[in-house]
Amino acid sequence: MPATEPEEGDVHTVERTFTHEDVECFGEVSGDRQAIHTEPDDEGRLMVQGLLTATLPTAIGGDLGVLARTMEYEFREPVYTGETITCEVTVTTTTERDDRYEITCAVDCRNEDGTTVMRSGFEGVIWKDEW
């Protein structure tokens, strides 16, 4: 059994400030080495790959033991190195089964100005015997 059972309305938060090294490493792994990710802008920043930003909710899902079934992303604004991004995952539905919890979550990632840079959602399971 999980330490605490997931409940509708539960909110989990993580913050991260992406670095040049993060963007460069992700570019190597993903193959996304477009100029906007490799050449600094006039302020010396790199644009963070969208899927690198999308790792924020997966960090929370990993902490909760979620095995994702579906994920959707809407990238609304660019994210740059040096910006602190706050990711909030809200459990919107939860169904208890004999061996698992089935959950649906909404995700909102905001920059330091409070602007939503990414919205997302996912469905997944938390197996009871994993805890």
Describe these PLM feature segments.
Residues 1-68, 131:
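Hot-dog-fold acyl-thioester-processing enzymes
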Residues 1-8, 90-131:
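HotDog/MaoC-like acyl-thioester-processing domains
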Residues 11, 52, 84-86, 90:
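Residue-level marker of beta-strand positions
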Residues 13-15, 72, 119-123:
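Well-ordered beta-strand positions in beta-sheet-rich domains
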Residues 70-84, 92-98:
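Active-site beta-strand->loop segment that positions catalytic residues and contacts the acyl thioester
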Residues 76-87, 108, 118-119:
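Extended hydrophobic secondary-structure segments
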